[in-house]
Amino acid sequence: MSSATTYIDVNAPVSDDIRSQIAGADNNALIVRLMFTTNHLSRWLTPIHDPNRLERSLYRGEPTAKELVIALRNEEQRVYPKMHLIATQTRANLDTLPEWQENPQSVERDTLQPTIVLMAQFRRLRQSTCGLLRSLPDDAWGLVGRSRREPDVTIRQLAERLAVTDYRYLRALDQTLDQVGARQGLAEIQKTHLDELLTLVPEHLTL
């Protein structure tokens, strides 16, 4: 992992190795990878009982742990409706979906919510995503959603994008928890870093 003084940038490049792992995973393994994200969050965040530890960053402009969880939830809210439309409608037109936008009321509500509640919201959304993916035969992963606003996309491509997004935000969260001292006093198993956790993710899985 990066040193404790590295500026944390969610949009830092994702290595070719990580991208290859995601692209090379079969559909079942990709579902497991997406579900593991909720496990990683629970492992890291549930033992931290002081909410202030999750709402601070080391440098100005860096995301807090809470902000990273919100971003993961928001991305799930953007992507799931697209997946569902493609899976349930012939010749799905993604432009019929309203563009997802964060409104001031939800921003204010998020400010008042504990990080653990926001994590639970993300978990419920991710469970819906994975439930949808599990219900699809392999050939349905290639179904395409059409759009004039953005490039056409398949269900598989959306799932891979979620996995890359997960990696970006989990990487930043792992670094943030270290840098702000949020893990002080926790058991070693609760401080396991992302690189080690990712070794548990299968690339191929036969069910």
What are these model-derived regions, one by one?
Residues 2-13, 17, 52-101, 144-207:
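Short, contiguous alpha-helical
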Residues 9-26, 33:
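Secretory/endomembrane lumenal or extracellular ectodomains immediately following the signal peptide
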Residues 20-27, 65, 108-115, 151-155:
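A short, mixed-charge helix-start or loop-turn motif at secondary-structure junctions
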Residues 24-53:
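Short, contiguous, helix-prone interaction/anchoring segments in small proteins
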Residues 25, 29-33, 57, 88, ...:
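Solvent-exposed interaction patches of small proteins and small membrane subunits
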Residues 33-34, 102-142, 157-162, 172:
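Acidic/histidine-rich alpha-helical segments that form the ligand environment
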